[in-house]
A protein has these predicted regions:
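Aromatic-acidic/polar surface patches that form glycan- and anion
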Residues: 12-15, 38, 42, 116-126, ...
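Conserved donor-nucleotide/metal-binding helix-loop-beta segment in metal-dependent transferases, i.e.
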Residues: 70-118
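Generic preference for well-ordered alpha-helical elements
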Residues: 13-16, 46, 69, 73-76, ...
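A conserved donor-nucleotide-binding helix/loop in the catalytic core
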Residues: 38-65, 71-75, 118-121, 152-157
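N-terminal anchoring/stem segment of glycosyltransferases
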Residues: 1-61, 89
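A generic structural motif
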Residues: 30-39, 95-100, 149-154, 171
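Short coil/turn segments at secondary-structure boundaries
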Residues: 17-21, 35, 76-78, 138-141
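Catalytic core and acceptor-binding pocket of nucleotide-sugar-dependent glycosyltransferases
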Residues: 120-171
Length: 171
């Protein structure tokens, strides 16, 4: 199992440079998709991720992260061990991070994005094996949801989490 980190970034803005520097500092092989392309919406982003996942070894562990507000705070050395233990203990094969806004921000985000099992998910970081992530993306994009320019990956992830507790866990 190889641990891979992937993001979709069309431009060098936000914290993208900080993400790249943190990846380099911690020895993370960060794959950047969409560089120099025109942003096509979240459905486009999810299709880019699907293309990448289809080319990965099915036993890889892939960390999908947002390009503009995520940084690495340490190497990914122990992520594979943690993930294997999580799945061996009966955990779902996709693990999503949570959003911890607190106060009125928590209420607002809950209204905008919804909740899964009472928790705000964060589509900025989720991981799994390529087959599990492809199943997630397929569920997220069901019924043409990814074809809309209004599609939002956080809402789509939350809806998939609600529908598929067997597929998505919350960390």
């Amino acid at each position: 199992m190889v641990v891979k980190a992937v993001t979709v970034a069309t431009a060098d803005e936000g914290f993208f440079r900080a993400l790249q520097q943190s990846a380099q500092r911690h020895g993370v092989d960060l794959r950047v998709l969409g560089c120099g392309e025109k942003w096509g919406g979240f459905g486009w982003k999810l299709r880019k991720l699907a293309e990448f996942l289809e080319a990965c070894d099915p036993d890889d562990l892939v960390l999908c992260i947002d390009a503009y507000d995520v940084v690495f705070l340490r190497p990914l050395d122990d992520l594979e061990t943690w993930y294997r233990r999580h799945v061996a203990d009966g955990g779902a094969p996709v693990v999503s991070s949570i959003e911890d806004r607190g106060g009125i921000g928590d209420v607002t985000a809950g209204v905008l994005f919804g909740r899964c099992r009472g928790t705000l998910l964060n589509a900025g970081t989720y991981m799994g094996t390529p087959p599990a992530l492809l199943a997630l993306l397929q569920d997220m994009c069901r019924a043409g949801a990814c074809d809309s320019r209004d599609a939002d990956d956080q809402r789509l992830l939350t809806s998939a989490c609600v529908r598929r507790p067997d597929l998505v866990d919350i960390d």
